[in-house]
Amino acid sequence: MPVYVDYDVPADLQERALESLEVARDTGSVKKGTNETTKAIERGNADIVFVAEDVSPEEIVMHLPELAAEKGIEVVFVETQDELGNAAGLEVGSAAAAVVAAGDAEDEIEDISTKVEDLQ
């Protein structure tokens, strides 16, 4: 487990979270990549943050969980950058993503945030 991963997110919850990311991508707004995700967190625009567990070097995303915690934003850790990039609508992997407008996935994202909060 990477240094920046504070808790294990069960596979079924990861799958639900990635599906909600796809819905938010299609009906709302999603920020993709570490830099855009960092800006969304700092500005308080992110509803939920996704971080891949297979990022190398780890320092690229190491700041995100702590920054999100300071702002009261939940973080979902997903297994691979490819899964995250795919769900975010990219043809390549993505180390991080943030939902800034949930669209039709609003209720699902709130539920996932609550479940992730319980994991901590």
Swiss-Prot record:
Keywords for the protein's UniProt record, in alphabetical order: Cytoplasm, Ribonucleoprotein, Ribosomal protein, RNA-binding, rRNA-binding, tRNA processing
Pfam family, one: Ribosomal_L7Ae
Keyword Cell inner membrane tagged: no
GO cellular component annotations of the record: cytoplasm; ribonucleoprotein complex; ribosome
Alphabetical list of SUPFAM superfamilies matching this protein: L30e-like (SSF55315)
GO biological process: maintenance of translational fidelity; ribosomal small subunit biogenesis; tRNA 5'-leader removal
Membrane-traversing stretches: none
Subcellular location: Cytoplasm
Domain of life: Archaea
InterPro entries per record: Ribosomal_eL30-like_sf, Ribosomal_eL8/eL30/eS12/Gad45, Ribosomal_eL8/Nhp2, Ribosomal_eL8_arc
GO terms for MF: ribonuclease P activity; rRNA binding; structural constituent of ribosome
Oligomer status and interactors: Part of the 50S ribosomal subunit. Probably part of the RNase P complex.
Protein family: Belongs to the eukaryotic ribosomal protein eL8 family.
Function: Multifunctional RNA-binding protein that recognizes the K-turn motif in ribosomal RNA, the RNA component of RNase P, box H/ACA, box C/D and box C'/D' sRNAs.
PANTHER family: 40S RIBOSOMAL PROTEIN S12
Protein name: Large ribosomal subunit protein eL8
Natural source organism: Halobacterium salinarum (strain ATCC 700922 / JCM 11081 / NRC-1)
The organism's taxonomic lineage, starting at the top: Archaea, Methanobacteriati, Methanobacteriota, Stenosarchaea group, Halobacteria
